Amino acid sequence: MQPIEQPGTGPDDITPESQDTNTAESAESGAETGHPRRIRSFVRRAGRTSTGQQRAINELGPRFQLPYTTEPLDWDAAFGRAGAKRIFEIGFGMGETTAHIAQLRPDDDFLGVEVHEPGVGALLKLIGEREIGNIRIVSHDAVEVLAQMIPEGTLDGIHVFFPDPWHKKRHNKRRLIQSPFVARLAAHLKPGGYLHCATDWEEYAHQMLEVLSSEPTLENTADGFAPRPDYRPVTKFEKRGLRLGHGVWDVVFRKRG
């Protein structure tokens, strides 16, 4: 089945009606045709890469973008250091949140996965402007990156911020945060590693909480929804939504061990 063409926005451009590229097509759910679907971490969306974004890709891509391969990633070689915590982000939108967190946590290494070229260019532009050295980018389906490049039990954290809510009920099965995929994510965490999801779609927030709570290898860090961790910034679109009375929910679980 081909990826569904649908516009969207990332964690730096969020409303309940318009979210980022993350989605899921679950083999357990099945397609409308009756055939099983594989999990896919994105939808294609239209968007023009600006001159500045393209320049950043051309000039900074060779240093900060990593090719997708079917071999395990050598983090130490990719980041030029050893011993840093390893954080994996699925779908970083236009990259403002990723850049902010990486600056706030310079001792951690961040691998962001995003297929939307304008978003990749935007994050590379921020990397150059702010002289950020602890981010690397892979432009590929995050599900395949996780399966092929990230060995199990090697991640200190996973971020999934504002995935597509697929708010129509008949599309709910396309959501990324479902039990089979969460089990995969948990398998790639180290004991004590965390999985942090955030959404501004309340019904999806409750689904996230239910799904993560049902994963036996994970435990909640809070009684229900978590307070927003200090490292996750409030974006301008989130502020606008909060002024309009829209909520934002964070769910943070840790790997038992």
UniProtKB/Swiss-Prot annotation:
One Pfam match: Methyltransf_4
Any one GO cellular component localisation term in the record: tRNA methyltransferase complex
Family: Belongs to the class I-like SAM-binding methyltransferase superfamily. TrmB family.
Composition-biased stretches (Basic residues): 36-47
Start and end residues of each stretch annotated as Interaction with RNA: 170-175
SUPFAM superfamilies the UniProt entry points to: S-adenosyl-L-methionine-dependent methyltransferases
Source taxon at top rank: Bacteria
Binding site for substrate: 168, 200, 235-238
Gene3D superfamilies (alphabetical): Vaccinia Virus protein VP39 (3.40.50.150)
NCBIfam families in the record: tRNA (guanosine(46)-N7)-methyltransferase TrmB
Molecular function GO terms recorded: tRNA (guanine(46)-N7)-methyltransferase activity
Catalytic site positions: 164
Organism the protein comes from: Ralstonia pickettii (strain 12J)
Pathway it works in: tRNA modification; N(7)-methylguanine-tRNA biosynthesis
Residues covered by region (Disordered): 1-58
Protein name in the entry: tRNA (guanine-N(7)-)-methyltransferase
Catalysed reactions, semicolon-separated: guanosine(46) in tRNA + S-adenosyl-L-methionine = N(7)-methylguanosine(46) in tRNA + S-adenosyl-L-homocysteine
Enzyme class: transferase
EC number: 2.1.1.33
Known function: Catalyzes the formation of N(7)-methylguanine at position 46 (m7G46) in tRNA.
Binding site for S-adenosyl-L-methionine: 89, 114, 141, 164
Keyword list, A-Z: Methyltransferase, S-adenosyl-L-methionine, Transferase, tRNA processing
Compositionally skewed regions (Polar residues) per UniProt: 16-26
